[in-house]
């Protein structure tokens, strides 16, 4: 890819990047979209007391977030490690804010509009006061999380960002970026290796030991004590692995990687829920193996791969859509979930057309946000606030 080509993966940077990793990020974002469709059936079951709430299709789709964290560590380390003699910490923060925050704001606005479309009705049937919804909107725009049970946690489900739930991962992504700029980038490869191993041990203890009680690596979405520390470890371990991979990476040209890795992600996310009989969470153990061993392998393969022609164009489109799709699809899911609950629908067979509409609408909305808002706004912010660097 040419150095002056616009890319959603690394906006305003002049260093070439890995197109296949962009594409895999897009594949993972689409799988998150499908995962949340099936999560809706589980949520409706639990809300209506009609089932056990286990997600039975794409059961492990939530660990796409952990795949994103590895990609983030890899891309940031690759893009910035050798630039600190030309760039200071504030310039780095500006770059990352320009990259991430415009769509975060748009996601909050869309989330507010989606909530308004159902009359600000909470999951328990009560109505959230308009003033507190506006407070939640403002706080989300400034990335200030809601603590469970405070008035501006307006949906009553304990989410950090009740207008747009996936904002929790951006909260930890920001922490990862700040950690990188302040101290992680200064670590030697040996120290980073030790740091990553220690984080891996903490990660295994927390999740395989089922400290959260979730029997899965699904923490971080709320700000209670278990979820905050669990979410922090959940982000830092794969993020540091991504950094370590970028520093030690030795490329080899491998053909067909995009399709191999895409199929692998589908298969890994589709493994059925693994029930546990003792104190060890076998479900979390499987997800830990994915995060600690299999995802880094996929990132390495993606960085080794080459794409041209139709596959290359597909990777560019997927990469550009990945972040907008991730950050704007969930407000539509809230409406979908409310519809499932009210109509007692718990399987895809009973709502195939509506589910297809949700998927198409989410992708279309992401594309419109990308082209009409995200790209123009980031270009303007870059011209306004970033000095051209060599």
Predicted features, each with a name:
Residues 27, 38, 68, 171-175, ...:
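Active-site His/Glu-centered metal-binding helix of metallohydrolases
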Residues 53-60, 100-174, 202-225, 289-303:
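Membrane-interface helix-loop-helix regions
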Residues 21, 91-92, 100, 169, ...:
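Alpha-helical transmembrane segments and their helix-entry boundary regions
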Residues 32, 69, 75, 108, ...:
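Helical transmembrane-bundle signal
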Residues 2-20, 30, 34-59, 78-90, ...:
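Alpha-helical transmembrane segments in multi-pass integral membrane proteins
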Residues 176-198, 241:
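Hydrophobic, aromatic-rich transmembrane alpha-helices
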Residues 96, 100-104, 321-328:
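Loop-to-transmembrane-helix entry motif
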């Amino acid at each position: 890819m040419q150095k002056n080509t616009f890319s959603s993966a690394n906006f305003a940077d002049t260093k070439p990047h890995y197109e296949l990793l962009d594409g895999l990020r897009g594949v993972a974002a689409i799988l998150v979209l499908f995962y949340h469709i099936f999560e809706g059936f589980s949520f409706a079951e639990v809300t209506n007391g009609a089932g056990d709430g286990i997600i039975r299709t794409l059961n492990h789709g939530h660990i796409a977030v952990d795949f994103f964290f590895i990609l983030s560590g890899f891309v940031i380390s690759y893009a910035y490690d050798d630039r600190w003699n030309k760039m200071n910490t504030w310039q780095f923060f500006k770059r990352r804010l320009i990259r991430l925050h415009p769509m975060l704001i748009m996601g909050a606005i869309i989330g507010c509009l989606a909530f308004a479309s159902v009359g600000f009705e909470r999951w328990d049937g009560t109505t959230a006061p308009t003033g507190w919804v506006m407070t939640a909107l403002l706080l989300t725009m400034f990335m200030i999380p809601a603590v469970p049970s405070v008035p501006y946690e307006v949906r009553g489900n304990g989410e950090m960002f009740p207008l747009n739930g996936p904002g929790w991962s951006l909260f930890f992504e920001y922490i990862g970026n700040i950690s990188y700029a302040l101290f992680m980038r200064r670590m030697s490869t040996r120290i980073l290796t030790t740091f990553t191993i220690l984080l891996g041990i903490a990660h295994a203890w927390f999740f395989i030991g089922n400290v959260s009680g979730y029997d899965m690596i699904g923490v971080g979405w709320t700000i209670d004590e278990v979820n905050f520390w669990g979410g922090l470890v959940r982000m830092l371990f794969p993020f540091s692995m991504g950094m370590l991979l970028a520093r030690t990476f030795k490329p080899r040209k491998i053909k067909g990687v995009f399709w191999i890795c895409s199929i692998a992600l589908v298969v890994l996310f589709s493994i059925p829920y693994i029930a546990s009989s003792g104190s060890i969470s076998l479900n979390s153990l499987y997800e830990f193996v994915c995060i600690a061993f299999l995802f880094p392998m996929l990132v390495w393969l993606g960085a080794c791969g080459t794409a041209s022609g139709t596959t290359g164009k597909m990777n560019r489109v997927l990469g550009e859509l990945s972040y907008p799709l991730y950050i704007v699809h969930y407000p539509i899911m809230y409406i979908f979930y409310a519809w499932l609950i009210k109509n007692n629908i718990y399987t895809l067979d009973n709502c195939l057309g509506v589910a297809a509409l949700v998927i198409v609408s989410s992708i279309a909305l992401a594309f419109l946000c990308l082209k009409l808002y995200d790209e123009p706004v980031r270009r303007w912010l870059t011209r306004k606030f970033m000095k051209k660097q060599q």
